[in-house]
């Protein structure tokens, strides 16, 4: 791929050669990385996840060029001295390393291929990293379009939630050309503690979809277990403590418990506000369903989880965190 032989970081007259691997400890690698770090990085999508991710790039000394469809969310960055663009195309015109964090496949297609999209102004050799969770087939199509422009596309969806985004402890699942992984890793390590190369474009999305399907199933299971225990006379904090020292322990029980009052600093203790929305979980489960259909893979619990989250969206839970499944099971009595 011609794009893998391009230079990055030229915006300020500093060059970053991305087409040749170097030993991590070599002076050339250290100097190259240091120079590249002084060049602007584009960031598009400043929602619940994108906002803290962008802030962690700032903390690591990266100047940012930002865009969001809602201009108000850019104000605090502008006040901090960062550049705010009027469109994704303007971001691409000013930065040759761009990270996107968007809600859906449709949003990603618009940001990359729309009338004022990245591809209208993208420079040869640019590195485009999409951290949205979208259909793997859409990632592959975007990669083809980006390659035609002489640039490089990598999918790098994340896991860990808003808390990990704030603390810089996200897990990134990266798909794309392996020779470009080190260039992406440099940026992603500023926002995450785990950056894993998964394979070709689309494999990062596949890994994320599998993870979120399991997350939804485990959250429903945790909510059901907690609800059953509470109705059987157990104190919720005591039950959570027992689960978390037993074989039923999982992230949904020990880090993101869905029962109000059991844990501090989680959406369940804030009327299920913030966090990862029910609509987004339903979307991701739909992606898992599509992937299962195309690969002829049975996902019995995944399909049931998809039905439950779709029902929640229709019952007024769409804007609440996905852990509100506890409230849904407790109050709606769906079965």
UniProtKB/Swiss-Prot annotation:
Q: Which PROSITE patterns match?
A: 3_HYDROXYISOBUT_DH
Q: Name one GO cellular component term.
A: mitochondrion
One GO MF annotation is: NADP binding
Cite the Gene3D superfamilies for this sequence: N-(1-d-carboxylethyl)-l-norvaline Dehydrogenase, domain 2, NAD(P)-binding Rossmann-like Domain
Transit peptide feature range: 1-35
Q: Which family does it belong to?
A: Belongs to the HIBADH-related family. 3-hydroxyisobutyrate dehydrogenase subfamily.
Q: What is this protein called?
A: 3-hydroxyisobutyrate dehydrogenase, mitochondrial
Say which species the protein is native to: Mus musculus
């Amino acid at each position: 791929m011609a794009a893998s032989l391009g230079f990055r970081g030229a915006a300020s007259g500093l060059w970053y050669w991305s087409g040749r691997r170097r030993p991590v400890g070599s002076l050339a690698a250290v100097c190259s990385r240091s120079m590249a770090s002084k060049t602007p990085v584009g960031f598009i999508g400043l929602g619940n996840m994108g906002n803290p991710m962008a802030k962690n790039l700032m903390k690591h000394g990266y100047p940012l060029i930002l865009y969001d469809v809602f201009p108000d969310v850019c104000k605090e960055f502008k006040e901090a001295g960062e550049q705010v663009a009027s469109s994704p195309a303007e971001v691409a015109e000013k930065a040759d390393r761009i990270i996107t964090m968007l809600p859906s496949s449709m949003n990603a297609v618009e940001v990359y291929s729309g009338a004022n999209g990245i591809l209208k102004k993208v420079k040869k050799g640019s590195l485009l990293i999409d951290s949205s969770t979208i259909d793997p087939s859409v990632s592959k199509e975007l990669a083809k379009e980006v390659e035609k422009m002489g640039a490089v596309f990598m999918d790098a969806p994340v896991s860990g939630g808003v808390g990990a985004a704030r603390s810089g402890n996200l897990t990134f699942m990266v798909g794309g050309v392996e020779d470009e992984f080190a260039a992406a890793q440099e940026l992603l390590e500023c926002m995450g503690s785990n950056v894993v190369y998964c394979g070709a474009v689309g494999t990062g999305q596949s890994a994320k979809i599998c993870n979120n399907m399991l997350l939804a199933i485990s959250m429903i299971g945790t909510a059901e277990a907690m609800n059953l225990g509470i109705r059987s006379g157990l104190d919720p904090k005591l039950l959570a403590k027992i689960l978390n020292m037993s074989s039923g322990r999982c992230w949904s029980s020990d880090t993101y418990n869905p029962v109000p009052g059991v844990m501090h600093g989680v959406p369940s203790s804030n009327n299920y506000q913030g966090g990862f929305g029910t609509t987004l979980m339903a979307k991701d489960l739909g992606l898992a369903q599509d992937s299962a259909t195309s690969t002829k893979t049975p996902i019995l619990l995944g399909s049931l989880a998809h039905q439950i989250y779709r029902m929640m969206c229709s019952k007024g839970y769409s804007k609440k965190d996905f852990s509100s499944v506890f409230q849904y099971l407790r109050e709606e009595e769906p079965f």
